[in-house]
């Protein structure tokens, strides 16, 4: 029994034990927002990991509608029970692939595949042998923000109580 088969058996057992009713497959769209494909647990089987779940990639910003047939391949190693779902739900992340006559291949613009290629390039070029990628969630709160654009000038003005210039 290979590692994936063992993990799939573990997932099936977890679904029975936790009375899972839905399987939620998570991916990011081209802008980095979470997207979901959700199926009832009855439709979930080993073929899901082999053939994936088909979806229209144009809805996610991945492809024009004429070439939008894509497949989501779940990664069993990412499975967990969603503690916030109102219905018992198992969640998994995975990979997005394009459908081709030669078989499915990873979609080169999917953020996960971009990062995998970056890691591969880094290792091949000898830059490093390990990479840590972390998103930086950053935002600013302004009390006022104004801008002006005229034929001779443009500019902006921002102000916030927390700014150094507002403290004496």
How should these model regions be labeled?
Residues 1-168:
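Glycine-rich, acidic/polar active-site loops that bind/position phosphate-bearing ligands
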């Amino acid at each position: 029994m290979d590692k994936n088969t063992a993990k799939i058996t573990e997932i099936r057992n977890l679904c029975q034990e936790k009375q899972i009713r839905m399987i939620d497959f998570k991916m990011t769209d081209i802008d980095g927002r979470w997207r979901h494909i959700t199926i009832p647990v009855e439709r979930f089987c080993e073929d899901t990991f082999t053939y994936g779940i088909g979806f229209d990639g144009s809805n996610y910003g991945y492809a024009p509608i004429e070439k939008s047939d894509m497949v989501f391949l779940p990664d069993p190693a990412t499975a967990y029970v969603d503690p916030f779902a109102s219905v018992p739900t198992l969640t998994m992340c995975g990979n997005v692939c394009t459908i081709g006559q030669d078989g499915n291949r990873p979609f080169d613009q999917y953020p996960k595949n971009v990062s995998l290629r970056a890691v591969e390039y880094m290792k091949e070029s000898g830059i490093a042998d390990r990479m840590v990628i972390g998103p930086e969630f950053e935002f600013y709160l302004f009390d006022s923000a104004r801008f002006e654009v005229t034929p001779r000038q443009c500019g902006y003005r921002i102000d916030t109580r927390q700014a150094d210039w507002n403290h004496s």
